[in-house]
């Protein structure tokens, strides 16, 4: 996959299927990205429930409109429940986006997509996409997560750089 460096113009979008109530991690990373100065959009329930049956045409259309309307260029997907179900849900969306030329290397908007979930789910996603999708199994430190997403060092919030109080704070897109 081509590498597209993060720029201040990038807009991050987060999707999390409604059935999964683990919102803590999504909000944590969203707030950290906002602290770095990026615009972040967290999908509302309408989008998050569409994702559960994204193979239904009107559902995909809703998700696509959400992405294009908000000019989302970095897309995160979080799912902490059943690995096979989570992988299937994510991969269906991934292939629909790909078939629709939504990725930057195809001339589309989305410069990167990543998946946060249980280690087993991450392994399936990584395997089925030949490593094209970055995965977060949920034991990363905030700083590690931001670096892994490609956030430039000078954008990292001072609180992360200067204090150790985050050290015990395991970010998971998880909890």
Predicted feature residues:
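Acidic-enriched, low-complexity/disordered segments with a strong bias for Aspartate over Glutamate
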Residues: 5, 10, 20, 35, ...
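Cofactor-cradling patches in redox/metallo enzymes
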Residues: 30, 39-132
